Structures are given as structure tokens and as C-alpha cells.
């Protein structure tokens, strides 16, 4: 680096698990400046936190027969909160399988729901 700021040409990004071009090709080869162990190198690589995803059992009520509808989804904390807001605060309902089987989609369009 020359000066006080980093030049774009001086930044080299390597995805985790990739071998840089100047790395030793054979496992027996070692470069002279290879003083750090793999563990020290891993500590230096800053890990990007990924959102933790969890299984959730979601329950809703069919607007036609009031049966409880259950499904499982995998979501982050933000994702499950968005789904909750969508199901609770908006005009969105899920129809149960039995109502769809019994009436069909066209039949449900003509029924009143609560």
C-alpha cells in the first residue's frame, strides 16, 4: 500500500475454500513466507454471520370451515416475523385442503368466508 488509502488493485478477494493463484500446488511445497499455521489463518479471516434459520410450526384457521391449518416452514427470525405480520395484519387467509377438495377453487370463490 502506498499512501494513506488502499488502492483497488491492492485488494484481492478470495472466497473461503478457494486456493489463491500463488499458493503451492503440491502438498509438499511450502513458500518461504509461510510462517502462520492454518488455525491462525482461519482466525484472521473475518466470518460473515449468516442468519440462523429455524423450523417453525405455523397454525392458521380456514376461513370457510374454521379448521386449524398447520404447516412447517424454515425461516430466520426476520422471516417468521414477516410471515406472522402477513397472516395476522393483512387480509390473507389460507384455505384448508378439505375445503379445496370438497368445493374446488371455483366453488370456494362463490362461498362466503368469515
UniProtKB/Swiss-Prot annotation:
Placement of sequence motif Nuclear export signal: 80-88
Annotated region (E7 terminal domain), positions in chain: 1-43
Lineage, opening ranks: Viruses, Monodnaviria, Shotokuvirae, Cossaviricota, Papovaviricetes
GO terms (BP aspect): DNA-templated transcription; symbiont-mediated perturbation of host cell cycle G1/S transition checkpoint; symbiont-mediated suppression of host innate immune response; symbiont-mediated suppression of host type I interferon-mediated signaling pathway
Name of the gene: E7
Keyword hit for Repeat: no
One Gene Ontology CC term in the entry: host cell nucleus
Disulfide bond positions: none
Similarity field: Belongs to the papillomaviridae E7 protein family.
Intracellular or extracellular location(s): Host cytoplasm; Host nucleus
Compositional bias ranges of the Acidic residues kind: 31-42
Function noted in UniProt: Plays a role in viral genome replication by driving entry of quiescent cells into the cell cycle. Stimulation of progression from G1 to S phase allows the virus to efficiently use the cellular DNA replicating machinery to achieve viral genome replication. E7 protein has both transforming and trans-activating activities. Induces the disassembly of the E2F1 transcription factor from RB1, with subsequent transcriptional activation of E2F1-regulated S-phase genes. Interferes with host histone deacetylation mediated by HDAC1 and HDAC2, leading to transcription activation.
Region of interest called Disordered, as start-end residue ranges on this chain: 17-49
Keyword terms, alphabetized: Activator, DNA-binding, Early protein, G1/S host cell cycle checkpoint dysregulation by virus, Host cytoplasm, Host nucleus, Host-virus interaction, Inhibition of host innate immune response by virus, Inhibition of host interferon signaling pathway by virus, Interferon antiviral system evasion, Metal-binding, Modulation of host cell cycle by virus, Oncogene, Transcription, Transcription regulation, Viral immunoevasion, Zinc, Zinc-finger
Domain notes: The E7 terminal domain is an intrinsically disordered domain, whose flexibility and conformational transitions confer target adaptability to the oncoprotein. It allows adaptation to a variety of protein targets and exposes the PEST degradation sequence that regulates its turnover in the cell.
Complex and partners: Homodimer. Homooligomer. Interacts with host RB1; this interaction induces dissociation of RB1-E2F1 complex thereby disrupting RB1 activity. Interacts with host EP300; this interaction represses EP300 transcriptional activity. Interacts with protein E2; this interaction inhibits E7 oncogenic activity. Interacts with host TMEM173/STING; this interaction impairs the ability of TMEM173/STING to sense cytosolic DNA and promote the production of type I interferon (IFN-alpha and IFN-beta).
GO MF: DNA binding; DNA-binding transcription factor activity; protein domain specific binding; zinc ion binding
Modification after translation (UniProt): Highly phosphorylated.
Zinc finger (unnamed): 62-99
Name this protein carries in UniProt: Protein E7
Keyword Cell wall biogenesis/degradation found: no
Amino acid at each position: 500500500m502506498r499512501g494513506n488509502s488502499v488502492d483497488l488493485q491492492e485488494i484481492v478477494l478470495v472466497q473461503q475454500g478457494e486456493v489463491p493463484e500463488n499458493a503451492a500446488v503440491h502438498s509438499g511445497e511450502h513458500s518461504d513466507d509461510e510462517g502462520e499455521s492454518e488455525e491462525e489463518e482461519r482466525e484472521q479471516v473475518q466470518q460473515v454471520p449468516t442468519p440462523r434459520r429455524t423450523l417453525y410450526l405455523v397454525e392458521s384457521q380456514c376461513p370457510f370451515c374454521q379448521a386449524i391449518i398447520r404447516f412447517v416452514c424454515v425461516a430466520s427470525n426476520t422471516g417468521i416475523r414477516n410471515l406472522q405480520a402477513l397472516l395476522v395484519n393483512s387480509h390473507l387467509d389460507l384455505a384448508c385442503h378439505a375445503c379445496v377438495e370438497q368445493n374446488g377453487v371455483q366453488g370456494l370463490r362463490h362461498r362466503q368466508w368469515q
